[in-house]
A protein has these predicted regions:
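Conserved AMP-binding/adenylate-forming core of the ANL superfamily
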Residues: 3, 20-65, 69-73, 90-95, ...
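Structural core segment of the AMP-binding/adenylate-forming
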Residues: 10, 45, 49-50, 77-149, ...
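Conserved pre-ATP/AMP-binding loop-to-beta segment of ANL
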Residues: 19, 131, 136, 151-170, ...
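AMP-binding/adenylate-forming catalytic core of the ANL superfamily
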Residues: 89, 106-108, 255, 376, ...
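Conserved AMP-binding/adenylation subdomain of ANL enzymes
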Residues: 189-206, 214-254, 268
Length: 528
């Protein structure tokens, strides 16, 4: 028997077997899984009432809220495609995403009303606008709770093709403009099963959603935690003290976040004021980590702390650096911490190789460098409306990550460098080309290049090296102010240096590796 794969099965299972359990907590609001499921049914019905058809895109601009978690199932039940948008992007980028995706409906939190009002007039499409937690204003003609109240909880779901796109996540890349990563129903279903198995979760577990749900599928948590009937607790804005209080109050078992989040937690004066004994696992991802951070998390939080690795294009989880029992009994504790700070080993259902430029596997000695390539059902369908980028990324049946790494004799992978010119700062992907384009818009700039430099707080930050036009003058502060008018705050270069010329190869291409090297001198890895 062949049954189409759909994550809607996870919601239905949770409602059937854990219906009376509190499944979602958002501030002072709690929803049982039965209530949560009903709200997703009503959302699907309401979307149809707005004219949303199967395969239409529905965008959300909001924090980690119960409404966004409801969209992970309600939008899919309507047969539409969920497109959560990074709220840290500029109005220009968000407008581009809404147009490129052809969004039929846009849901936004009331806090973002000024942003949406600014964007709406310039959109080529004319989506329906729905405001959440506020009165209809600006382009919004509907309010979320009123829309749900008018929806039916009893309409049959749309017929779903497991190979149809279910979710769309726009990720920054080397092109400057965000690319839409298209994930199918089948991909999401299998990723949830594989991640749940790898993360060893059950219905006794609970997760605090620290990772924004617009980021790489919320690391898959909306699906794999619902699958097992675990509990979702929403964190709308990151604050270390608030995070610690929620862990104690709701007996959180799993925390996922980027290194900067956990560095802030460890530095918080509130750390010693809370009972964190419920915590079992801390998964660090989104940017490279270090043994020192893993050690600090284990010693101060009394948890198993490990690194996870993945990309938007892979749903996202590919590897987890969980310890293996036979190594625990044969290796010293220090070596265990080193392994848990690596990129890890492949989760079930994922094939990972590290290959040379000729496509041969590197030696499993932890020394020879190669590119990570992946073959799995968790890999994206492709980049939305971008066949050229898709063909460049998926070649000969393998997805090419652009991440350079080594692999040891136990299969543990360690990322050493990046082939792509993407800077990962605090878990955010930053395109060096986008920053360069902003700098080139300044009349004094002749040439420039942006590279990643190590930073103790953010892991990496963008720094720029510029050559001014003959006779022109500009200070670093002036160029930074110029960028501030054109870029999201986290994309602004933290430093600008001036040179007489930039190093170039035989074809005239700027050699960013030479520019990057002085910043990383003394570091073992070229990611931080």
């Amino acid at each position: 028997m062949i049954v189409p794969l759909s994550v809607l099965e996870f919601r239905d299972r949770a409602a059937a077997y854990f219906g009376g359990r509190i499944g979602v907590i958002d501030g002072e609001r709690s929803l049982t899984y039965r209530e949560y499921a009903e709200r997703t049914h009503r959302l699907a019905s309401a979307l149809r009432g707005l004219g949303v058809q199967p395969h239409d895109r529905v965008s959300f601009i909001t924090y980690n809220t119960h409404q966004l978690l409801e969209a992970y199932y309600g939008v899919l039940e309507a047969g539409a495609v969920l497109n959560p948008i990074n709220i840290r992007l500029t109005a220009d980028d968000i407008g581009y995403i809404l147009d490129h995706s052809g969004s039929k409906a846009v849901f936004y939190h009331a806090d973002f009303a000024p942003l949406v009002e600014r964007i709406a007039p310039s959109l080529t499409a004319h989506p329906a606008f729905v405001v959440m937690e506020g009165e209809p204003q600006g382009p919004a003609t509907h309010e979320y709770e009123g829309l749900l109240a008018a929806g039916s909880p009893d309409e049959p779901p749309a017929e779903l093709d497991e190979n149809a796109v279910a979710e769309l996540f726009y990720t920054s890349g080397t092109t400057g403009r965000p690319k839409g990563v298209a994930l199918t129903h089948r991909t999401l279903y299998l990723h949830a099963l594989q991640a749940a198995l790898a993360l060893r979760i059950s219905d006794t577990d609970s997760i605090l959603h620290v990772v924004p749900l617009f980021h790489v599928n919320g690391w898959g948590a909306p699906h794999w935690m619902t699958l097992v009937g675990g509990q979702h607790v929403m964190l709308r804005r990151f604050d270390p003290a608030a995070l610690l209080a929620l862990v104690e109050r709701h007996r959180i078992t799993h925390l996922l976040g980027v290194p900067t989040v956990f560095n802030a937690v460890l530095a918080s004066p509130a750390l010693e004021q809370h009972d964190l004994s419920s915590l079992r696992y801390v998964i660090v991802g989104g940017a490279p980590s270090s043994p020192a951070l893993i050690r600090a998390l284990e010693e101060r939080l009394h948890v198993t702390a490990v690194v996870g690795y993945g990309l938007s294009e892979t749903s996202p989880v590919l590897t987890i650096a969980l310890p293996r029992q036979h190594l625990l009994t044969t290796e010293p504790p220090e070596r265990r911490l080193e392994r848990q700070a690596t990129t890890g080993w492949a989760i079930p259902g994922v094939r990972v190789r590290v290959v040379t430029g000729e496509g041969r596997d590197v030696r499993p000695d932890g020394e020879q460098l190669g590119e990570i390539i992946v073959r799995s059902n968790v890999v994206m369908e492709g980049y939305y409306r971008d066949p050229e980028a898709t063909a460049a990324a998926i070649r000969d049946g393998w997805f090419h990550t652009g991440d350079m790494a080594t692999i040891d004799d136990e299969g543990y992978i360690t990322i050493k460098d990046r082939a792509k010119d993407v800077i990962i700062s605090g878990g955010e992907n930053i395109s060096s080309v986008e920053i360069e384009n902003a700098l080139y818009a300044h009349p004094a700039v002749f040439e420039c290049a942006v590279v990643a430099a190590p930073d103790d707080t953010w892991g990496e930050v963008p720094v720029a090296v510029a050559v001014l036009k003959p006779g022109a003058a500009a200070t670093a502060d002036e160029l930074i102010a110029h960028c501030r008018e054109r870029l999201a705050s986290f994309k602004i270069p933290k430093r600008i240096e001036f040179r007489d010329q930039l190093p170039k190869g035989g074809t005239g291409k700027i050699l960013k590796s030479e520019l990057r090297e002085p910043f990383w001198r003394g570091y073992e890895k070229r990611v931080h």
